[in-house]
Amino acid sequence: MNTLIFTGQVAIVTGAGQGIGFEIAKQLANQGAGIILNDIDQSLARQAAEVIRENGGECIAFAGDSSDPEVINGMVDEAVKCFGKLTMAVANAGITLFGDFFEYPVENLRKVLEVNLAGSFLLTQAAAKQMRQQKSGGRILLMSSVVGHQAHQFLGAYAMTKAGLEMLAKNLVLELSPYGITINSVAPGATLTERTLTEDPAYPKTWSAITPMGRPAICEDIANAALFLLSPFSGHITGQSLVVDGGWTSVSPLPDLSNMEVK
């Protein structure tokens, strides 16, 4: 890709204080986009935005809960105030919350639904309204997961939200396409992030053994797919989910979680 392919574009990226979200925000900024970088952790948001600015990118930190309508509307307003428009939105923020189905706490269920589904829906709605008003199209990207396609132990609530996001994208094709707005999702497989490595030090070994490509993804792998779907090269692609899993869903072996402690 041309290193300045996103010049003149403006993106909101949620859950971007670290991991996949940060990598997407960083790559967009490196290629010319202005960024509103969101994270619920104010310190992470500020640090991530500073790293991007130190590398020559335009980036504004916007801390807050990305499932809160006031925060979402504030991010859209900030994009318009600081950059004059909003052309891309990446609903990356999400939580996992493993748990035994029979004992899964209702408060965990509500939180997963609120952050993963409601937050993504509300960001999509607010961003699309702004894009419709601008009359110049736009790109919306949802962060799904391979567990929205394939069963996995202890992830019933999480998997439900990810499958729901993909169906949201398909349905919104009918309402967004007349305005030149595309909406797609990326479905990462096992990915090395600060969170996955902290939760399970054996994560790289476990997933390398059962991934056909011989390794889990790194954040750059997911960001590269995201940038394609946000770029001009994907202008006739909408309502689709791009799986980035090193071939895992082709064979779908499950990791051994027999020793995993779940609540």
Annotate each predicted stretch with a short phrase.
Residues 4-35:
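Canonical Rossmann dinucleotide-binding motif of NAD(H)/NADP(H)-dependent dehydrogenases/reductases
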Residues 83, 121, 215-244, 249:
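C-terminal substrate-recognition "lid" of short-chain dehydrogenase/reductases
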Residues 90, 177, 182, 237-239:
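Short, small/polar-rich loop/turn modules that mediate ligand/substrate recognition or access, typified
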Residues 100-101, 105-113, 196, 207:
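Substrate-binding pocket helix/loop in short-chain dehydrogenase/reductase
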Residues 145:
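Residue(s) in the substrate-gating loop at a strand-loop-helix junction
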